[in-house]
């Protein structure tokens, strides 16, 4: 995300991230598996 901010600038980076839900972002950009994302969600909701 920080690379995108530096490369695109604030406005373009925000537009990129507004298009994604957190789940979509973690799956596509973070290269995390669906079970890994679920585990993160479980931990964060505690």
From Swiss-Prot:
Stated name of the protein: L-amino-acid oxidase
Principal EC category: oxidoreductase
GO cellular component: acrosomal vesicle; extracellular region; immunological synapse; lysosome; sperm midpiece
Catalytic reactions of this protein: an L-alpha-amino acid + O2 + H2O = a 2-oxocarboxylate + H2O2 + NH4(+); L-tryptophan + O2 + H2O = indole-3-pyruvate + H2O2 + NH4(+); L-phenylalanine + O2 + H2O = 3-phenylpyruvate + H2O2 + NH4(+); L-tyrosine + O2 + H2O = 3-(4-hydroxyphenyl)pyruvate + H2O2 + NH4(+)
UniProt main location, coarse: secreted
Cellular compartments annotated: Secreted; Lysosome; Cytoplasmic vesicle, Secretory vesicle, Acrosome
Induction: By interleukin-4.
Organism: Mus spretus
Involved pathway(s): Amino-acid degradation; L-tryptophan degradation via pyruvate pathway
Gene: Il4i1
């Amino acid at each position: 995300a920080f690379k995108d901010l530096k490369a695109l600038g604030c406005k373009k980076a925000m537009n990129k991230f507004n298009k994604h839900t957190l789940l979509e972002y973690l799956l596509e950009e973070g290269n995390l598996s669906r079970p890994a994302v679920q585990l993160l969600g479980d931990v964060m909701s505690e």
